[in-house]
């Protein structure tokens, strides 16, 4: 009866051409009329899911997360931010709907110290001085249950591992794409032995490494199976594994969004204690002993951030920017500088500026690609611009693809002075249709007047096609030996990368080279060739957007088709949650 009323209501409203927002509110009204207000509140999860399906919001991460297993956390947030059921429509609908404030568009401002020194544009580092070599790994996503021969194309976003559907496929002899001996591109994560093979290759071919940066996301994409116990185990296991291959090399980790339990959800301390992430930070503090200064353990164990003076005149800052993750639902309660991480960053940069030190920042989530809350991304942008003379390296991950991002003196004007470049390194995991890869930077070394800027970098990748075909004789290959030579750069400075974007507008050879490296030459990337101007403009616009504004792309004629995002980690629970929900008669719609 209730379902019939809903269908009739939607059909009638469709003839009147009312908005989806009004349809959504009508559904809530009908449910309240049928159930009563108390039951409507009790069944808010089921209403949310029904709204998601009815209005096809499957591509909205907010909606997809709701139907996961983590209803306790979600319900706490909902009770804090929703006063009336109508506001659920305001939360879920992409358009303006009701009086609920869209957390994805909320802007707030940090107080940033004045007295900024005159900006000194970065110059190409002259040759002849000592250099440092730094390894950059990101998005390891190691799957301890990866099983050779299981279905790699299993129909869910996480394959190559034992699960009901996969086992049934194997037993019936219906395997379309067996999981390869060394990994499988697509919906599979990193086998542990692929990780160790990579580390062995680096140890034997890279020469002396001065330090290693790991920009987060250690665990697999099996988000429904996340627990504090499994995450703590993986933090220790993978930290110990890296240490075993590089016992004398310091390693500096950053917190990734997949370190959250639930995924993406790093709870600030304004939430009840049972949701706090102290267990994660303590596990990291224990696993990273010897790499983290004793005086930074308190900071690490509070909000996942720390600083270390790694050389005379150079500091490493590990910033936990999952506190800016757009899918961290705790931030929908209050996203203004959670746990004081950005104020902590300001304090660290001010201390460095006061004594003339340079700073490298290792973090996980770039401010672009719609992955960060705009308020957080814009505040971070302004902080880095304030300390543009101090920050000489930013090393991120998360996107799985190889990218760079420009920062400008005016965050909304690509014609203003380029101030910084952000490096987003390629992932180790083949998940999201890329071959595994890693990067090694050459950096201006320890000497009087060192800039500690990146001079150049090389990139290596693992061709899963050829290596799975010859599994007893695998090899890592050089994707390119020098980024400067590959892209015709005079050096790793903002003006050169800004000019590279300009050149790629018309230089087909240069753009195609960048596009191929972005995909690590993977023929499995599932994307159509980028042969038209709209596609090209999407990549060029991406490189300018370290926060979300189209004002940085107004000169790109012919339209913009943004690159496809990486695979949606939430859809893994979509079908199973639907099936589980159908059995809930007490809230059945």
From Swiss-Prot:
It is found in: Secreted. GO terms for molecular function: acid sphingomyelin phosphodiesterase activity; hydrolase activity, acting on glycosyl bonds; metal ion binding; sphingomyelin phosphodiesterase activity. InterPro entries: ASMase/PPN1_MPP, Calcineurin-like_PHP_ApaH, Metallo-depent_PP-like, Saposin-like, SaposinB_dom, Sphingomy_PDE. Glycans are attached at residues 109, 237, 334, 463. Residues 18-101 form the Saposin B-type domain. Zn(2+) 1 binds at residues 139, 141, 217, 400. SUPFAM superfamilies: Metallo-dependent phosphatases, Saposin. GO terms for biological process: ceramide biosynthetic process; lipid droplet disassembly; sphingomyelin catabolic process. Pathway: Lipid metabolism; sphingolipid metabolism. Disulfide bonds join 21-97, 24-89, 52-63, 154-159, 160-188, 530-535, 541-553. Its main location: secreted. Belongs to the acid sphingomyelinase family. This is Putative sphingomyelin phosphodiesterase asm-3. It comes from Caenorhabditis elegans.
